[in-house]
Amino acid sequence: MTSRQKVQRTAPDPSAALNVATRPARNAGDTRARILAAARVRFSLDAYENVGTRDIAADAGVDAALVNRYFGGKEKLFDEAIVDAFAIKDNFDGVDMSRFGEIITTLVMEGSEERREAKFDALGILLRASGSPATQERVSARFHAEFVLPLARLLRGRDAELRAALIASYLIGLATMKHALGSPLLGCATQRKAVVTVSAAIQACVNG
């Protein structure tokens, strides 16, 4: 073997060096955030019982053992993944309550930016939790705390919490028909009529 051949065999691969140099450094905070983001998507796309920590870790590009290290297991990871999943406060602070029915109905009909990008889906969490003994009560409590109670505070007046729950019922039903079931009756041709009809019912709840 010539010295030239030895050099060729032992010379480092420049592409490998480039990959190492350009690979972003990953600290504990970044790893934790990646796991949490992957979990939010997984739990909204499949039932809790069907989601494994290995699946989440693979989506996040980390070792499965890190899920337990940072979150203490799947149950605690799920609880953290649904924090702020249904939060209404930031979206409606200062909103014109005389147009609330129209605004929120239009938002539900059009879908959120996250849904359009096929990322986290709060509706998916709600629907899947309804058939899951492991998560039903926790998701219900989270939805009540993050959506129903803050909305009731916006509504004020008599039976505000009941009215907020009725509004939530309208919205969940509408979102299920439109986005989960893809009903052709709620397609583009009839969307405006649907918004007008449902928003009127919601506005009646707002006005008390």
In which residue ranges do the predicted regions lie?
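Alpha-helical DNA-contacting segments of helix-turn-helix folds
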Residues: 78-85
